[in-house]
Amino acid sequence: MGEHEQVKPLETSSSKVKAKTIVMIPDSQKLLRCELESLKSQLQAQTKAFEFLNHSVTMLEKESCLQQIKIQQLEEVLSPTGRQGEKEEHKWGMEQGRQELYGALTQGLQGLEKTLRDSEEMQRARTTRCLQLLAQEIRDSKKFLWEELELVREEVTFIYQKLQAQEDEISENLVNIQKMQKTQVKCRKILTKMKQQGHETAACPETEEIPQGASGCWKDDLQKELSDIWSAVHVLQNSIDSLTLCSGACPKASSLRGHKGHQCLSPPLPSWDSDSDCDQDLSQPPFSKSGRSFPPA
């Protein structure tokens, strides 16, 4: 019965191991689980056999006691003294048979106990090996997942930095576009003013003469304004070209932002032809790319 009490903690530990091994997914872990289940069933079968042998010994002891009582009753009934020696001999034979039976049962119980002990040690060794393999596999999986996480984190950081740089560049381009729009408005005003002065000069050629010094100053100011305009145009064109190249080289980075990305749409540039009557009256373009030509006075 002491062996049976030692088996119960083993069953409890086996149930705990079973509960832990439920989460195993690979085939190797399923095989280990099946092996543990088979060992558990063998241990239970051996425990039942051990209990059955104990019960058999108890029943034999009871039967022996009953037979001894019957013998005593028969001796009391058959009280002749002539059979006293025969009764003693019979009693001695029964005692010897009972001792032989006890010896055989003891040997059987010892063999069963040894078998149970060996099975328990084997099961413990297999369970330890299975747990070690499972722990090693968990460590390897955790290491692999951490490495993948680091790679993903580095890639996300790189994409975020690239998007930040693109956003800064877009903001700078928007500022340049706004400056360009202001410059265009200013240039349009200058062209309108030049047109009006041209009409006034054509209407009154004899009554009004422009001083030579004032004309030179006015031309210098106009040349400076046109130079500033064309420098702003070149800066804006370079910014637009660089933005186009950057967006064409990295289409995936911008799509990663999804609906969170900033969609920067520049306002439409005012057309140079918006003042149609001014352009139709002039026979030459307002100014060349060099910024040195002037419209006819």
Swiss-Prot record:
Coiled-coil region(s): 147-297
Primary role: Functions during spermatid development; may participate in the centrosome reduction procedure of spermatids and is required for the formation of the connecting piece/sperm head-tail coupling apparatus (HTCA) and the correct and tight attachment of the flagellum to the nuclear envelope.
A GO cellular-component term linked to this record: sperm head-tail coupling apparatus
Keywords noted in UniProt: Coiled coil, Differentiation, Spermatogenesis
PANTHER family given in the database record: COILED-COIL DOMAIN-CONTAINING PROTEIN 159, TRANSMEMBRANE PROTEIN CCDC163
Matching InterPro entries: CCDC159/163
Subunit: Interacts with DYNLT2. Interacts with GGNBP1. Interacts with OSBP2.
Taxonomic source organism: Homo sapiens (Human)
GO BP: gene expression; single fertilization; sperm flagellum assembly; spermatid development
Listed name of the protein: Coiled-coil domain-containing protein 159
Region of interest (Disordered), residue spans: 256-297
